[in-house]
Amino acid sequence: MFKREEIIEMANKDFEKAWIETKDLIKAKKVNESYPRIKPVFGKTHPVNDTIENLRQAYLRMGFEEYINPVIVDERDIYKQFGPEAMAVLDRCFYLAGLPRPDVGLSDEKISQIEKLGIKVSEHKESLQKILHGYKKGTLDGDDLVLEISNALEISSEMGLKILEEVFPEFKDLTAVSSKLTLRSHMTSGWFLTVSDLMNKKPLPFKLFSIDRCFRREQKEDKSHLMTYHSASCAIAGEGVDINDGKAIAEGLLSQFGFTNFKFIPDEKKSKYYTPETQTEVYAYHPKLKEWLEVATFGVYSPVALSKYGIDVPVMNLGLGVERLAMISGNFADVREMVYPQFYEHKLDDRAVASMVKLDKVPVMDEIYDLTKELIDSCVKNKDLKSPCELTIEKTFSFGKTKKNVKINIFEKEEGKNLLGPSILNEIYVYDGNVIGIPESFDGVKEEFKEFLEKGKSEGVATSIRYIDALCFKLTSKLEEAIVTNTSEFKVKVPIVRSLSDINLKIDDIALKQIMSKNKVIDVRGPVFLNVEVKIE
């Protein structure tokens, strides 16, 4: 907390002095907590759900009402809608199946098996029979069976499960039996049911839409087909409705997603639930992608199918695959990777990788941490001293009643050199997935590397960590360790940097894995010629 009154008094006496001196009150974050190692974290929506919401709003803007169509459809409805074609259509449907409920009796043999487990049945026989009978009749849910058996016999649930496994093996041998119910393979099967029920409840014409999941038994999933997908479908019912309504709706809907110019081409499939010569494929031009794309299908339902549902007016239906539109909007090449990104490789951008490059060792004590900045400034200021030369920094630290006098001596004894090597001011950048050390100046850099390094500096992400910064933190971290362990002296020598660890840096395993898998590089090589002796008294 600031001492506000003292600051105001200081400012009243000498504003300029107060303005400069109070800057020290704003404490800088420690290196591993500073930018770019801290980065904003945003929630992320899924492209399919984004597209669903955009489609919902697009339909609503066009005056449609939203409905949820049945997901479970009886196969009889498929026959009513498709006629003779139904058998071929049902091949792509998933049927719902369930386990039958076995007629399990409580024979003398079963009672004997239970009693061999050390459980007396005689007093509880009637209760146990009622439970087994209730399960067979469907009045008792399967997931309650073990609990009810345990309660009836006054035993633990673990023992109840053992009885179910060992005495009633019939439950383990059950095989699912298919019903006549299917999972909706396309939205049309639900529209017939919905429109039929609304005919006497809503004034004509009416416009409905539904965006929901469908299930299709594909032979295999590939980059453009999944066994479950979302259909964004609409239906318009009323006198005078025809394929012109389909064309207008297609244009109105898809123009909201950046498409311009539309082609309407007769669909060769000719599904029997559509009136002949009305089933139409919609191709739209996307100026950003500069190509024509098939994006929707529409048609007018056949009077034959409509009549079976008590519908006596034309109904136009248009549908499009949400995943298809999301792939176009997001420029995805594989629907599987778009829908299930968690099962595919996650690519980190340069900004993300830069946030994962951190100092390995950092002093904990504030006094020693603060010494690091002084050390860095002195090294930068004196880096070009001609050898033989040395730079000495002395500090006294107080820890309660104990004082420690520290003498740090940075030196170069060999003649004809500088105090520190030419790479000492190199800074770590992340560029095109690579982690590289880039010099402050490109003087003397070989032409074959110069263009890459220049691009790295102008287009890459700077970590704001120089070699000298990281090395000085390594030095003060060792100093802190020496003070704590009562070590009187130590040396640090780093002649040539070959890896991140040589300059006290580390990188997150996630980033490292990507760098290796993408054949990217970590190249921080360079001469720093750091020689240090530290004495503590």
UniProtKB/Swiss-Prot annotation:
Its EC number is 6.1.1.27. The keyword Amino-acid biosynthesis does not apply. Keywords: Aminoacyl-tRNA synthetase, ATP-binding, Ligase, Nucleotide-binding, Protein biosynthesis. GO terms for biological process: translation; tRNA aminoacylation. Substrate binds at residues 186-188, 231-233, 273-274, 317. One of its GO terms (molecular function) is phosphoserine-tRNA(Cys) ligase activity. It comes from the Archaea. Transmembrane segments: none annotated. It catalyses: tRNA(Cys) + O-phospho-L-serine + ATP = O-phospho-L-seryl-tRNA(Cys) + AMP + diphosphate. Signal peptide: none annotated. The keyword Ligase applies. InterPro entries: aa-tRNA-synth_II, aa-tRNA-synth_II/BPL/LPL, O-Pseryl-tRNA(Cys)_ligase, Phenylalanyl-tRNA_Synthase, SepRS_C. Pfam families: SepRS_C, tRNA-synt_2d. Homotetramer. Interacts with SepCysS. HAMAP family: Sep_tRNA_synth (MF_01674). Belongs to the class-II aminoacyl-tRNA synthetase family. O-phosphoseryl-tRNA(Cys) synthetase subfamily. Catalyzes the attachment of O-phosphoserine (Sep) to tRNA(Cys). This is O-phosphoserine--tRNA(Cys) ligase.
